[in-house]
Amino acid sequence: MTAAFTVRVKDETASKLDQLAEKLDRSRSYMAAEAIEAFVEQQEWQLAEIEAGLTEADRGEFASDEDVAKVVRKYVKSARQS
């Protein structure tokens, strides 16, 4: 089942969407639906991760000072080598 609704976007965004649709041989509607589906999936994932993190925090599950220091050292070392 599908639902239809109207979305307002800037003219520039509509133009870019039309260009992409043409290059990919798809309709504007298809491209918009794909973009919305991807956005919804990403937002659902992000919210689930935030909720899981908050649940862990409520249980007092935090990274130790040593765990944090290891991660910092890893990325500081990587940045210096670049």
From Swiss-Prot:
Name of the protein: Uncharacterized protein y4kO
GO biological process: regulation of DNA-templated transcription
Keywords: Plasmid
Domain of life: Bacteria
Classification via InterPro entries: CopG (IPR002145), Non-func_TypeII_TA_Antitoxin (IPR052991), Ribbon_hlx_hlx (IPR010985)
